[in-house]
């Protein structure tokens, strides 16, 4: 499928999350054609994916190190740089790449298949839980606390608890007591 066809599909797609994931899949394909790695969806868009759109954000946050390649690809499909965001007026879409990589070499990612050979990578749920728990604890973000509890209730039996606890004790996170309390509260 050609780039213009994918852009038309994105424009016609009703689900905001599916539109975002299709855009990341297109970016992934274009970057891989340049022998570059796939970007990884992080932040609110990843939270929207795992919460099944209980939470929604209007922008796409990506972890990607090669800003030059990403900028070139975004420009080639009609995005314009506006401050820290790349904006596509026609698609009413905004992309930001606030992180150059995921936290740690062993950070898992979920690869989402979208059909027609399109796929995108999303931060692993354990790292997303830690990220949102940090926002809840350190920035006093109530919604992030609620979303962490929702994720633990929904995915608790499938989470990699040793990995989560290993990440939670790192000095930059310091969220082990919160993780253990949430685990207890949801009955795991």
Where do the protein language model's features map onto the residues?
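Compositionally biased terminal segments of proteins
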Residues: 1-188
